[in-house]
């Protein structure tokens, strides 16, 4: 199954459908239909906003129609799913649920979770509301104290201000099956800020945090505003030995179908030295792009590790 716990307007699932369409283009009509059904039935998409859920459902139907994967006028044929069947599956698998305080609607956890969680603090969420202060305190308290059925606290990495993206990172790892992959688009501040230390410890010490792509403040991406943007890659429940940090990246470093170009700047953080020079805070250093400055920074890091 593929999941997005804050599906928004459905941008990620649209991209997945387009990749799916490209990859099945050479198959028989029956194989295309069966593969498309399998993909739709494996979707696990939720959002706490009814508006977002309605938008995502409509987007998925429109994309399926444009890709020629559904029969708009009938009950389907050898190569296409009927519209009524597609809409029924989509309605069942795109739901309005609070992923932070609610229960996941599916028994089987996802093996792949890709999302861009909201970059908000609780106090920003209710800014301007006449009862904002009371609402903020109430939600913050519920999130801090929320317990699972076995008595465990759901969010163990809360520290300082309650930032929603931190909660979504921790929750995403809980939702996935052991060995499942999580990729999240988050602010770069999570890599270094002190208040994210408990979350980084969780990423490194209880999971395999193996990659991060970092784009600086002037990234020219369509999201992120003036903040640095990072994409973290985690395998749930495994062991972190080496984190490969790519960056600072530019738009030209992104390669369609490959991820990043082969000469994108990167360096590797080995667990032992990394723990030593960060005093087990697992902070990821902000690197210069210049080859000379980069070499100096890496040399300094090596000395700290020694």
Question: What function would you assign to each model-found segment?
Answer:
Residues 19-42, 63-88:
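Flexible phosphate/Mg2+-sensing switch loops adjacent to catalytic phosphate-binding sites
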Residues 2-6:
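Conserved class I S-adenosyl-L-methionine
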Residues 7-14, 21, 48, 53-54, ...:
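Signature of N6-adenine DNA methyltransferases within the class I
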Residues 43-47:
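Conserved SAM-binding motif I beta-strand of class I
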């Amino acid at each position: 199954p593929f999941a997005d716990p804050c599906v928004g307007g459905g941008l990620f699932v649209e991209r997945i459908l387009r990749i799916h369409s490209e990859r099945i283009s050479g198959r028989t009509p029956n194989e295309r239909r069966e593969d498309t059904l399998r993909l739709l039935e494996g979707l696990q998409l939720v959002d706490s906003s009814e508006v977002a859920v309605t938008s995502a459902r409509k987007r998925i139907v429109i994309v399926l129609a444009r890709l020629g994967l559904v029969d708009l006028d009938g009950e389907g044929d050898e190569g296409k799913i009927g519209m009524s069947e597609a809409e029924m599956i989509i309605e069942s698998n795109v739901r309005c649920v609070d992923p932070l305080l609610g229960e996941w609607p599916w028994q089987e956890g996802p093996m792949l979770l890709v999302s861009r969680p909201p970059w908000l603090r609780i106090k920003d969420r209710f800014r301007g509301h006449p009862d904002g202060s009371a609402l903020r305190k109430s939600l913050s308290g519920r999130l801090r104290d929320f317990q699972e059925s076995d008595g465990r606290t759901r969010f163990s990495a809360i520290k300082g201000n309650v930032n929603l993206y931190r909660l979504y990172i921790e929750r995403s790892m809980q939702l996935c099956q052991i060995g499942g992959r999580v990729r999240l688009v988050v602010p770069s501040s999570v890599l270094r800020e002190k208040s994210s230390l408990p979350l980084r410890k969780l990423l490194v010490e209880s999971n395999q945090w193996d990659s991060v792509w970092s784009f600086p403040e002037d990234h020219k991406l369509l999201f992120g505003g003036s903040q640095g943007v990072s994409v973290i890659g985690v395998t749930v429940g495994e062991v972190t030995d080496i984190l490969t940090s790519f960056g600072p990246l530019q738009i030209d470093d992104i390669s369609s179908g490959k991820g990043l170009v082969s000469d994108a700047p990167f360096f590797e953080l080995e667990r032992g030295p990394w723990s030593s020079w960060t005093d087990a805070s697992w902070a990821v250093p902000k690197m210069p792009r210049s080859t000379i400055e980069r070499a100096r920074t890496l040399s300094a890091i090596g000395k700290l590790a020694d």
